[in-house]
């Protein structure tokens, strides 16, 4: 037996200036064991705390279920109400067989006889492609492909094309809409899923399941409800709660630790909503910055400013959930390493970790939004205008306010989660977590 009184496992605690766990004296105890249980709460008090938490979570679940029931979209939703093609048109698929129109010369000649277009004009913005799905399946036809897609076109590229019989009078009835991306996107998704499961194991599987449930809430509730005329803020609050309940409890299980993270997330959502409501009004952000927004306002009668507020809340949900889960786990691990730590010391130790979170999230969201808005920023930079005026104009101002509000919500959620975790981690025996 070693005669050294200081265990090597306690060195990190001493380095941090935290008290080391003391050995439990032998003999009979009238109370519960302190080595694996709460230090200052008896069984009755711990039970009451769990009941209070159960009531709070139950109220959140009940409110969410009622909100889903009341706001659930009916047949009035505008999903699919706008035709994608003009009358007589249809969407098909094609594969480029050649970027040289001589490969489909017979089809080009037939079209020029009908519409009188010169063959040399076809060569400027068309490629030869075999129609693989839709009107004219099996034919090799010239497909209109202009601009950047034409420059990047290669034999074998798979296209989504629009067939418009009226267009035959001025050129080819087939025109480029987009690329078929099922294969590369599907491959990336499979690689991502495999890596998550391989690295995170059971937790990874559960997190993917939670993501699927949250995505289902977004796809089958939030989007249809917003397009059916329900109040955007109410839909966002209910949808956000449903997504967070699924993400937290499905991925991490039901425990006081995960409930702590959930409460921290709720606090962050509330703060973000309040900040977004104030920020959009104070900065006079209307959300009416492009044709897509104007289309929504005209067809769905959606308040664009409120919709912008909702987007700010949804944009920060993922990172918010990440920091609250990690903060709660950090405090729990501090308690497990040294069950003698007081709530104040647990909070202080947790905030040391939280400061690292804050330091990283300061640029995480900023870089994410900057990357998304890069073409817009470059276009704005072309203007002969003061930099500050450019940054505070239109869509760029929306991105800046969105980033600031999401970041403020994250920063405030960290101490809130840490405080809740420091108060609750001593309720549950260390070995139970």
What are these regions (language model features)?
Residues 261-269, 297-314, 360, 364, ...:
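Pore-lining and gate-forming transmembrane alpha-helices of multi-pass membrane transport proteins
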Residues 1-89:
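Hydrophobic secretory-pathway targeting helix
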Residues 171-211:
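Cytosolic-side membrane-insertion boundary helix
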Residues 322-384:
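Helical hairpin unit composed of two closely spaced alpha helices linked by a short loop
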Residues 191-194, 202-294, 302-315:
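Transmembrane alpha-helical segments that form the functional core of multipass membrane systems
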Residues 168-181, 223-235, 280-309, 380-403:
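Membrane interfacial helix motifs at helix-loop boundaries and amphipathic/re-entrant anchors
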Residues 75-183:
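Extracytoplasmic/periplasmic regions of membrane proteins
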Residues 368-370, 374-433:
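Hydrophobic alpha-helical transmembrane segments of membrane transport and translocation systems
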């Amino acid at each position: 037996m070693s005669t050294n009184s200081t265990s090597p496992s306690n060195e990190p605690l001493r380095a941090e200036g935290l008290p080391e766990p003391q050995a439990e004296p032998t003999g009979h105890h009238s109370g519960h064991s302190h080595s694996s249980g709460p230090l200052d709460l008896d069984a009755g008090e711990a039970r009451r705390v769990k009941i209070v938490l159960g009531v709070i979570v139950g109220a959140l679940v009940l409110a969410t279920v009622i909100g889903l029931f009341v706001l659930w979209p009916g047949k009035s939703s505008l999903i699919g109400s706008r035709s994608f093609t003009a009358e007589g048109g249809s969407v098909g698929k094609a594969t480029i067989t050649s970027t040289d129109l001589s490969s489909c010369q017979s089809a080009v000649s037939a079209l020029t006889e009908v519409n009188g277009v010169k063959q040399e004009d076809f060569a400027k913005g068309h490629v030869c492609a075999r129609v693989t799905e839709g009107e004219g399946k099996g034919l090799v036809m010239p497909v209109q492909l202009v601009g950047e897609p034409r420059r990047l076109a290669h034999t074998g590229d798979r296209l989504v094309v629009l067939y418009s019989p009226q267009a035959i009078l001025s050129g080819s009835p087939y025109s480029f809409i987009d690329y078929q991306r099922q294969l590369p996107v599907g491959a990336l998704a499979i690689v991502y899923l495999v890596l998550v499961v391989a690295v995170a194991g059971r937790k990874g599987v559960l997190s993917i399941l939670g993501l699927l449930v949250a995505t289902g809430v977004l796809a089958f509730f939030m989007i249809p409800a917003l397009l059916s005329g329900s109040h955007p803020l109410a839909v966002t609050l209910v949808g956000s709660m449903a997504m967070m309940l699924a993400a937290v409890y499905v991925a991490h299980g039901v425990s006081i630790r995960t409930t702590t993270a959930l409460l921290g997330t709720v606090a962050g959502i509330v703060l973000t909503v309040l900040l977004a409501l104030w920020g959009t009004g104070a900065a006079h952000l209307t959300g009416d910055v492009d044709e897509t927004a104007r289309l929504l306002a005209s067809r769905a009668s959606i308040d664009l400013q409120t919709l912008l507020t909702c987007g700010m809340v949804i944009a920060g949900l993922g990172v918010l959930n990440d920091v609250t889960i990690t903060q709660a786990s950090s405090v729990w691990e501090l308690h497990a390493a040294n069950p003698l730590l007081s709530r104040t010391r647990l909070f202080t130790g947790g905030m040391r970790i939280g400061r690292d979170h804050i330091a990283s999230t300061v640029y995480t969201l900023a870089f994410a939004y900057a990357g998304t808005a890069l073409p817009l920023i470059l276009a704005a930079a072309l203007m002969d205008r003061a930099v500050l005026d450019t940054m505070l104009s239109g869509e760029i101002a929306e991105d800046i306010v969105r980033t600031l509000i999401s970041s403020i919500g994250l920063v405030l959620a960290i101490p809130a989660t840490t405080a809740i975790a420091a108060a609750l981690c001593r309720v549950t025996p260390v070995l139970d977590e």
